[in-house]
Swiss-Prot record:
Lineage: Eukaryota, Metazoa, Chordata, Craniata, Vertebrata
Coiled coil ranges: none
GO biological process: cellular response to glucocorticoid stimulus; ceramide phosphoethanolamine catabolic process; lipid homeostasis; phospholipid transfer to membrane; response to food
Protein name, as recorded: Ethanolamine-phosphate phospho-lyase
Keyword Mitochondrion: yes
GO cellular component: membrane; mitochondrion
SUPFAM superfamilies in the cross-refs: PLP-dependent transferases
Cofactor: pyridoxal 5'-phosphate
Catalytic reaction(s) noted: phosphoethanolamine + H2O = acetaldehyde + NH4(+) + phosphate
Alphabetical list of Gene3D superfamilies matching this protein: Aspartate Aminotransferase, domain 1, Type I PLP-dependent aspartate aminotransferase-like (Major domain)
N6-(pyridoxal phosphate)lysine, modified sites: K278
UniProt biased composition (Basic and acidic residues): 458-479
Disulphide bridges, residue numbers: none
Organism, as annotated: Bos taurus (Bovine)
Length: 497
């Protein structure tokens, strides 16, 4: 399709007709993307960008097998799921086969938000309880029911935490309440959940569910310590609640060895409800809730029929089947393991070289780089992170920054990401970090101790901009600056190199 408008015309029309809260990546200088293929995106000038952040185009942008499956089915039939059709049952059968046996009943929706909203309904109907335990910094969707259980959202806005919502500390062993030097961080964090349950019961409240991403994404690429989920599930089920695993961002083989991220934590841990979305349709809007027969029967016993007009329609199911085929036929799980390990190795070498890198954490092709101003206090390097993602864009590499302090570089590329891509990305990052550290006077020798503060002496100009950014932090709307959505005001304040 030919372009209808110039980049500036497109931007002007967007500002006029699209809600101002709907942000674009790199808002101060957005990229106009006109096509994409595999792990590469192309702007209106034909410039190629390496996509390191798009976990929606899971098997690669515009994968020919996925496109062909959608086109073929659209030529035959697309209608709602009240009609009997093979695609939905075939997809449900194959999807269930990737999960533990007890997770066998599917409800198809169109987005992760719809899936998580339905999961809450299932949980509340199961025992008749209402309260929900969520993790600090969590994000589970944009519906009102999910904003209420997403501290990532309601803590940044004017909303007040609802009485039925209980927030447990995120199991972050790098900068959380219990860190890597704790004798048993898994038990310590799980005991925080138990305290919440006990306090709720003492107040006459009952827990319906504990919900968590198997690995927190918006929370800063957090991987819970081994054993944490098992203990939490024990406490929650003992209170009559269910465990909801949100796999919307981290499922479908992204971690490599396992198809679902929750499977990393052992065969003795099986959630009661699993939600999935983003990568499921490789850009086609589809999502799902999978649960046990017992929970599904309790939901049906309410007498209220569940119907979703587009959920599980023939075209969506055909797309979903094609995505499963590509993951298997192209060994994308194996690729996630191999390339993820290689990328992590390269990044750990950078960690010994650059004092701005405080922590590298991740599994497969889900990796976070926690940037810090000093290693002893682990002070988040927020402005530096924003500076880096813009500089990476100039090098034609797309990254974003997130986490509660927006200082964690997020890496979650399409699953066809290669070792050559990983090497190129790290080379660009190395050059930018080197330039930034030279400009700020930071040492970059590999012999620096992890526990030694980086006593950086920044140029007056850069230092004043960082101070100004810090002073405005509490006054500016944080929602305008997350996910790499750097606003004009923030861009004007980023470090100059």
């Amino acid at each position: 399709m030919c372009e209808l408008y110039s980049k500036q015309e497109t931007l002007a029309l967007r500002r006029k007709h699209i809600g101002p809260s709907c942000k674009v990546f790199f808002a101060a200088d957005p990229i106009k993307i006109v096509r994409a293929q595999r792990q590469y995106m192309f702007d209106e000038k034909g410039d190629q960008y390496l996509d390191c952040i798009n976990n929606v185009a899971h098997v690669g942008h515009c994968h020919p097998e996925v496109v062909k499956a959608a086109q073929k089915q659209m030529e035959l039939l697309n209608t709602n799921s009240r009609f009997l059709h093979d695609n939905i049952v075939e997809y449900a059968k194959r999807l269930s086969a990737t999960l533990p046996d007890r997770l066998s009943v599917c409800y198809f929706t169109n987005s992760g938000s719809e899936a998580n909203d339905l999961a809450l309904r299932l949980a509340r109907q199961f025992r008749g309880h209402q309260d929900v335990i969520t993790l600090d910094h969590a994000y589970h969707g944009h519906l009102s029911s999910l904003i209420e259980i997403s501290p990532y959202k309601f803590q940044k806005g004017k909303d007040v935490k609802k009485e039925f919502v209980h927030v447990a500390p995120a199991p972050d062993t790098y900068r959380g309440k219990y860190r890597e030097d704790h004798v048993d961080p898994a038990s310590a964090y799980a005991d925080e959940v138990k305290k919440i349950i006990d306090e709720a019961h003492n107040s006459g409240r009952k827990i319906a569910a504990f919900i968590a991403e198997s690995m927190q994404s918006c929370g800063g690429q957090i991987i819970p310590p081994a054993g944490y989920f098992q203990k939490v599930a024990e406490y929650v089920r003992g209170a009559g609640g269910v465990f909801i695993a949100d796999e919307v961002q981290v499922g479908f083989g992204r971690v490599g060895k396992h198809f679902w991220s929750f499977q990393m934590f052992g065969e003795d841990f099986v959630p009661d409800i699993v939600t999935m979305g983003k990568p499921m349709g490789n850009g086609h809007p589809m999502a799902c809730v999978v649960t046990t027969k017992e929970i599904a029967e309790a939901f049906s016993a309410s007498g209220m029929e569940y119907f979703n007009t587009y959920g599980g329609n023939p075209v969506s199911s055909a797309v979903g089947l094609a995505v499963l085929d590509v993951i298997k036929n192209e060994d994308l799980q194996g690729n996630a393991t191999r390339v993820g390990n290689y990328l992590t190795e390269l990044l750990n070498k950078q960690k010994t070289k650059h004092t701005l890198i405080g922590d590298i954490r991740g599994v497969g092709l889900f990796i976070g780089i926690d940037l810090v101003k000093d290693h002893q206090q682990r002070t988040p390097a927020t402005a530096e992170a924003q500076h880096i993602i813009y500089k990476m864009k100039e090098k034609r590499v797309l990254l974003s920054a997130d986490g509660p302090h927006r200082n964690v570089l997020k890496i979650k590329p399409p699953m066809c990401f290669t070792e050559e891509d990983a090497k190129f990305m790290v080379e660009q990052l190395d050059g930018i970090l080197t330039g930034l550290e030279e400009a700020t006077g930071a040492e970059t020798e590999s012999g620096i101790s992890k526990n030694t503060p980086c006593r950086t002496k920044m140029p007056k100009e850069a230092q004043s901009e960082l101070l100004r950014d810090s002073s405005l932090e509490s006054r500016e709307n944080p929602s305008q600056k997350r996910n790499g959505l750097c606003t004009d005001s923030l861009l004007s304040k980023r470090l100059r190199t």
